[in-house]
Regions:
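Oligomerization/assembly interface segments of phage tail-like spikes and tubes
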Residues: 58-74, 119-131
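Short amphipathic alpha-helices in soluble, non-transmembrane regions
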Residues: 81-87
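Low-complexity, intrinsically disordered Gly/Pro/Thr-rich segments
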Residues: 102-115
Length: 133
């Protein structure tokens, strides 16, 4: 059985090991509080479902939204460039090996950039499926 927490950890590990995203700059999942200074990231995992297609014992589908938060007094291009590099990193077809499963991004959707109080926010949603080994 694939555990949701293990899938979350594998996605984070893949992101932190292959980009300039600093794990110390990850605001808590779904957190509304973001400390001052520099680029910060917020993640929210959503839409976890388990299906049982004929060719696999089970499959987990879900998505994660990554928001890149940047102080509004800085050039917004920095957040946009980082959002694009994250999108490129998870671009299908890609197969990420986990403990007892394979993780495959299926679709990447850039979300509209916005301003929220003192933050510029560039976001994207990564849809994925996880298959047992």
């Amino acid at each position: 059985m694939i555990e949701f927490q293990t899938v979350k950890l594998k996605i984070r590990e893949y992101l932190f090991s292959r980009t300039s995203v600093d794990s110390g700059h990850l605001a808590g999942e779904g957190s509304f509080f973001v400390p001052d200074g520099g680029l910060w990231f917020r993640e929210a995992f959503q839409e976890f479902t388990v299906t049982r297609p004929a060719q696999f014992s089970s499959r987990v589908d879900g998505s994660v939204v990554y928001e890149i938060l940047q102080p509004s007094d800085r050039d917004f291009r920095e957040a946009e460039v980082l959002r694009q590099s994250i999108a490129d990193l998870f671009q299908p077809p890609l197969l990420i090996s986990g403990e007892g499963f394979y993780l495959q991004p299926t679709r990447i959707v850039p979300l509209a950039s916005r301003l929220d109080r003192a933050w510029n926010i560039a976001a994207l949603r990564i849809h994925f499926s996880a298959y047992p080994v």
